[in-house]
């Protein structure tokens, strides 16, 4: 009788546990959304995750110039930077801000995390830290290091996973579920630095198009019931990449978006940010008059620098221009 009572108690506890079990799912269509979520403007569609080439444009310059001189362009020089918006730059197909990527039970609140790391298993995309720039890792181009900053936490990406707990202000919730939209995930500050070390690299030609498919950083979502729940803060991405790629919603990459040009360069060391030219009547200009304002620019060039705006695979051509941001003046000049 005692045995039967304990058995019954055990079976009852199983039912209680099953009834309170919570879990998250990846949302790929509207069938996972409640009427309340749909009425609130939330949507859903299939998404493929952080595949190597499924990345967007971070907003970096299309051409990044690298000097072969360690004195003209010393270690730590910022070569380029951009802010990657998760909605538009983390995947090849942009997300809408209200596109739901995951659905969790309301009991999961407090257990939901954004996880982020560098590509810790790729030698040229986030595996090896360089001591020359804090938080930066060797990149595919020789003498270049990349540093990524999570703009929600202010922390640098690392090959060792970091986490950010999601809170109710970043999701939609009804009486049964929590819906995690794309807007819940963080943007990134992406920086590229010149370094002296040549320890890890794949490219070193006078001109290299970045065709390295490996992303430099990843964002994953961790919640109960998902395989990504096994990712813990502090684990090494080199061996712990549970749920990649289909359960990771985004990645940061420069694949097919930048070209590295190496050679003798020039740099501007002194210049005014804005030059204001006094207004002048159209009639005066038509009669041959003009309006002037003096300004000074200091330009320093390396030996061998080539002055040209033409593309080249044999030299890092340099050119300087001036931007006129007054639309009327620009239109008149083009007539």
Where are these regions (language model features)?
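Outer-membrane beta-barrel proteins
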Residues: 301-307
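N-terminal export/ancillary region detector
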Residues: 23-267
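Bacterial N-terminal signal peptides that target proteins for export
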Residues: 1-8
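Hydrophobic helical h-region of N-terminal Sec-dependent signal peptides
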Residues: 9-16
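Short acidic, flexible loop segments centered on an aromatic residue
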Residues: 310-329
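N-terminal signal peptide c-region/cleavage motif recognized by signal peptidases
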Residues: 17-22
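Short, solvent-exposed loop/turn segments enriched in Ser/Thr/Gly
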Residues: 289-295
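Surface-exposed beta-loop interaction hotspot
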Residues: 260-284
């Amino acid at each position: 009788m005692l045995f039967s009572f304990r058995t019954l108690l055990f079976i009852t506890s199983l039912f209680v546990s099953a009834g309170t079990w919570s879990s998250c799912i990846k949302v790929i269509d509207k069938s996972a959304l409640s009427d309340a979520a749909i009425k609130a403007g939330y949507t859903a569609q299939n998404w493929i995750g952080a595949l190597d080439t499924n990345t967007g444009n971070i907003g970096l310059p299309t051409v990044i110039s690298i000097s072969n001189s360690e004195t003209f362009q010393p270690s730590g020089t910022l070569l380029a930077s951009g802010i990657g918006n998760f909605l538009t730059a983390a995947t090849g197909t942009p997300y809408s801000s209200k596109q739901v990527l995951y659905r969790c039970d309301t009991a999961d609140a407090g257990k939901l995390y954004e996880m982020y790391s560098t590509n810790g298993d790729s030698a040229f995309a986030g595996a090896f830290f360089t001591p020359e720039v804090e938080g930066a890792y060797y990149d595919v181009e020789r003498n270049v290091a990349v540093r990524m900053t999570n703009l929600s936490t202010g922390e640098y990406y690392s090959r060792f996973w970091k986490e950010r707990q999601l809170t109710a202000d970043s999701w939609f919730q009804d009486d049964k579920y929590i819906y995690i939209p794309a807007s819940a995930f963080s943007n990134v500050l992406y920086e590229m630095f010149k370094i002296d070390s040549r320890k890890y690299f794949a490219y070193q030609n006078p001109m290299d198009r970045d065709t390295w498919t490996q992303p430099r950083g990843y964002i994953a979502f961790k919640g109960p019931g998902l395989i990504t729940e096994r990712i813990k803060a502090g684990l090494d991405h080199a061996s712990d990449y549970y749920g990649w790629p289909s359960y990771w919603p985004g990645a940061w990459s420069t694949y097919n978006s930048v070209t590295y040009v190496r050679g003798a360069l020039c740099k501007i060391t002194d210049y005014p940010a804005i030059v204001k030219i006094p207004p002048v009547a159209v009639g005066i200009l038509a009669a041959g008059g003009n309006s002037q304002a003096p300004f000074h620019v200091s330009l320093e060039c390396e030996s061998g620098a080539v002055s040209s705006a033409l593309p080249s695979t044999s030299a890092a051509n340099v050119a300087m221009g001036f931007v006129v941001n007054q639309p009327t003046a620009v239109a008149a000049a083009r007539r």
